[in-house]
A protein has these predicted regions:
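ATP-binding/phosphotransfer module of carbohydrate and carboxylate kinases, centering on a glycine-rich
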Residues: 1-66, 71-136, 255-361
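Short glycine-aspartate micro-motif
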Residues: 71, 81-85, 137-141, 205-209, ...
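Short, acidic Gly/Pro/Ser/Thr-rich loop/turn segments
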Residues: 89-91, 147-149, 215
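Short, acidic, Ser/Thr-enriched surface-loop or helix-capping motifs
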Residues: 97, 150, 219-220
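Glycine-rich phosphate-binding loop and adjoining helix at the ATP-binding site
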Residues: 103-204, 334-345
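Glycine/GP-enriched mid-protein hinge/lid loop-to-helix segment characteristic of carbohydrate kinases
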Residues: 105, 116, 179-287
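Short glycine-rich anion-binding loops that position phosphate/pyrophosphate groups of nucleotides
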Residues: 145-148, 211-213, 329
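Acidic-glycine-rich active-site phosphate/pyrophosphate-binding loop
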Residues: 170, 226, 231-240, 341-351
Length: 361
């Protein structure tokens, strides 16, 4: 009986995922896709409809002869996913319907003094949950810029200052024990979204997130390597300068330390850019470079050289056909990307780097 229940649960999950991925799919198509009998599929679909996970939208036009099939969709009206993105100085929060619509979103500031786990917990229960109403929370996702060691229930992030000895995972599990809950790496989430919504057709590609932290996610044969915990690579802590500045990880000259958003002020000043003239505003280095500012061009080129050295080594190790650059790095504009494309060709294994295309997210 237990085995049968487990098989049925797996089949329910499979049916739901297929409906979620294929808008307007029919029972007949589900039967063909899953190799399950039509009565079995109908029974599974009926259970998902009764429990308000799916809706039957009635008959739709079909090229086939005979009775027209009924269209199935996920029930976005009744089901939500809660998402909390843990950043250094704020929480980005959202409630997403099962059919991928934003029902609610906000930003919650964080201070250095606050206990971040307590803040996240109170944000969920006091701000997000009241917005849910009678709808169902299908799951809670907490996204972090760091490594998630699910097996040992540990996370490590130099960006938000969490170490392996901090009992963050255990505290979250205790706080959210009544809800399906997961921790996800931010770069893995961005990469998956790129793969699904930007229609990436390359089976082997790398997504590089250049923000305050720098991370990479690798896809091989259309599959994310080692899941969404950020354990496949610590690209941001590859050293591009062994004599470079000290990184929070204890290494010197890490990509994150010299190319990440937190390094921009230091590097801009080193290139002779007078930041006092911006009076608290963020400098738009892309616009400055396009307007011919020599110092801004020097800054962007230097950043591209350092990032390209790391990318070329990643290409030599992994041999992707595509590298997608996302995050705040895209704000450095076309001059940054063109320099990356040029500089990648100057290092790494020529046969690999010459067959890899780089583009923005």
């Amino acid at each position: 009986m237990v085995i049968q229940q487990r098989i049925r649960a797996e089949n329910l999950k499979k049916i739901y995922q297929l409906v979620n991925q294929n808008r307007s799919i029919s029972r007949a198509a589900l039967s063909k896709e899953t190799n399950l009998s039509k009565p079995t599929v109908s029974s599974l679909v009926d259970e998902l409809i009764v429990n308000k996970y799916l809706i039957d939208c009635g008959t739709v036009a079909s090229q086939q002869m005979g009775r027209r099939p009924n269209e199935l969709r996920v029930n976005g009206t009744e089901n939500l996913v809660a998402v909390i993105s843990w950043r250094r100085a704020r929480l980005d929060i959202a409630l997403i319907t099962a059919d991928n619509k934003i029902a609610f979103r906000d930003q919650i500031p964080l201070t250095e003094e606050e206990d971040k786990v307590d803040k996240i917990t109170s944000t969920f229960f006091n701000i997000m949950k009241p917005k849910v109403g009678d709808r169902r929370i299908m799951g809670l996702c907490i996204i972090i810029p760091g490594i998630i060691d699910a097996e040992n229930k540990r996370i490590l992030s130099t960006v938000i200052g969490v170490g392996y000895s901090d009992p963050v995972v255990q505290r979250f599990e205790e706080a959210f024990h009544d809800y399906p809950f997961c921790l996800l790496n931010d770069t893995a989430c961005f990469a998956y979204a790129e793969y699904v919504f930007a229609n990436i057709t390359e089976p082997n590609f790398a997504y590089i997130n250049v923000s305050k932290g720098v991370g990479a996610c690798l896809f091989a044969n259309g599959k994310m390597l080692r899941g969404a915990g950020g354990n496949a690579t610590q690209f941001g802590h590859f050293s591009v300068d062994r004599n470079g500045p000290l990184c929070a990880c204890g290494n010197h000259g890490c990509v994150e330390r010299v190319v990440g958003e937190n390094a921009l002020t230091e590097r801009a000043e080193a290139c002779g850019i007078d930041l006092t003239r911006f009076a608290g505003r963020k400098p738009l280095y892309c616009d400055m470079a396009e307007d011919g500012d020599a110092h801004a061009k020097e800054l962007i080129k230097d950043l591209a050289v350092d990032l390209s050295f790391a990318i070329s080594n990643l290409i030599t190790l992994f041999n992707p056909s595509l590298v997608v650059i996302g995050g705040m790095g895209v704000n450095l504009g076309p001059f940054f990307l063109s320099n990356i494309r040029d500089e990648v060709q100057n290092s790494g294994f020529k046969e690999f780097v010459s067959n890899t295309w780089s583009q923005y997210s």
